[in-house]
């Protein structure tokens, strides 16, 4: 499950690094644009509400949030963005799901295929690895603001599956169908969220050796550096020696 693996912890650290590079600003704005296609009022659009909360958590400027909403609703140009997911394999036979948001799917699929090939991976057919993952909701909260007991009381009552300790933060994990109910229950309780999003959680993880792990991390880095890539999900776990090296 999300947050229960060393790979997930590396992703958290990488997320903070990405934020410094501005990559997360682009990602957050695209998520708002896509969410706003279903309506520009966050009160009646739970996905938009979550997208705005995630954008605020990384300090995306208010004007950029407002412009992204207008692009999604068609008030401004630039909202012609499609959501897609590509499936494939990395070194060691690791399963990969690459989620993208693009205004040119032909360009993006070519770039993703090239990155995979360059780093010892390959593109697969739609559905080739998706069955190895479960769609979950993951809500992240600051560790020093809440106790586990406080979160358990609200989150589990609302239908969350688990509350996990991720070192510097808490993670509330939900089934996809219960995500909005849990997030809204936390909001109603006055809980401030660092992020609230869906993720693909591997049903089983492949343990890789350090050499394969390094190859996989280079592949993931290359994919995430692509402007159209929103998220990369994989079913591998890193060996302790590589975790220490990356940490």
From Swiss-Prot:
Per the record, GO CC terms? cytosol
Annotated Pfam families: TACO1_YebC_N, Transcrip_reg
In terms of InterPro entries, this protein maps to:
Integrase-like_N (IPR017856), TACO1_YebC-like_2nd/3rd_dom (IPR048300), TACO1_YebC_N (IPR049083), Transcrip_reg_TACO1-like (IPR002876), Transcrip_reg_TACO1-like_dom3 (IPR026564), YebC-like (IPR029072)
Q: For this chain's UniProt record, which GO biological process terms are given?
A: regulation of DNA-templated transcription
Keyword Transcription present in the record's keywords: the answer is: yes
As for family, the record states: Belongs to the TACO1 family.
**What protein am I looking at?**
Probable transcriptional regulatory protein DVU_2259
